[in-house]
Amino acid sequence: MGGISIWQLLIIAVIIVLLFGTKKLRGVGSDLGSAVKGFKKAISEDESAKDAKKDADFVPQNLEKKEAETVEKQKQNDKEQA
């Protein structure tokens, strides 16, 4: 009673097709689809970049610690030999 029925929606759709034409509506649909696809791709790239950044931050910290330990061991060995 207060809602829009299927027939009213069908009439609105026919009027829109008559006003804009199928070519223009197809172009708008493809533009909208490519925009959504680009948005999803950007979101997934951003998440993978965050994951890669976490991994990259983890590895250098370990390397720095190992390098510092190696330098300290070399200094101790030099002192013992002298």
UniProtKB/Swiss-Prot annotation:
The keyword Glycoprotein does not apply. GO terms for molecular function: protein transmembrane transporter activity. The keyword Cell membrane applies. One of its GO terms (cellular component) is TAT protein transport complex. Residues 48-82 are annotated as: Disordered. It is found in: Cell inner membrane. GO terms for biological process: protein transport by the Tat complex. Gene3D superfamilies: 1.20.5.3310. Keywords: Cell inner membrane, Cell membrane, Membrane, Protein transport, Translocation, Transmembrane, Transmembrane helix, Transport. Pfam families: TatA_B_E (PF02416). It comes from the Bacteria. It is a single-pass membrane protein. The chain crosses the membrane at residues 1-21. Belongs to the TatA/E family. The Tat system comprises two distinct complexes: a TatABC complex, containing multiple copies of TatA, TatB and TatC subunits, and a separate TatA complex, containing only TatA subunits. Substrates initially bind to the TatABC complex, which probably triggers association of the separate TatA complex to form the active translocon. Part of the twin-arginine translocation (Tat) system that transports large folded proteins containing a characteristic twin-arginine motif in their signal peptide across membranes. TatA could form the protein-conducting channel of the Tat system. This is Sec-independent protein translocase protein TatA. It comes from Aliivibrio salmonicida (strain LFI1238) (Vibrio salmonicida (strain LFI1238)).
